[in-house]
């Protein structure tokens, strides 16, 4: 239930985001949502870092801590990080340029445990020469795991994982997804 102040802010057009945090093996997870869906999933070293990141991404929004209201979103993301079994499927409030949204929607269609390249993704969205722009859209992606840019690789693997969230946090996720697929296939055979 929205507070009276939140109802007034909505009428005035003030953007309201509720957020909560949780620990995971990759660091602190912050999920922020609006009335339209999840507006950000951020990963960082501590609560202060992810809150600063949220504030920098949404400087004109009314940010409200709401651990209880974000609990189900946090649980889905943390469960995915701890033991990936399927895609993170949350209703998103996609915020970005038209091009970024096009990239992010295409990234969401990359199958669990599979990867593609920036080059292939650029071709897929109909902009084969926009490889760098596709990479930039992945770099600024505020929807960690729900828009799985960790599955998009540079054609030279040594240059991959340039996401803001960092190589050490994102690199293991593709391997974890592929391991889950292998284990699932092994269980079916047995």
Task: Please report, for each region that a protein language model flagged, where it lies by residue.
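Short glycine/serine-rich loop segments
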Residues: 129-171
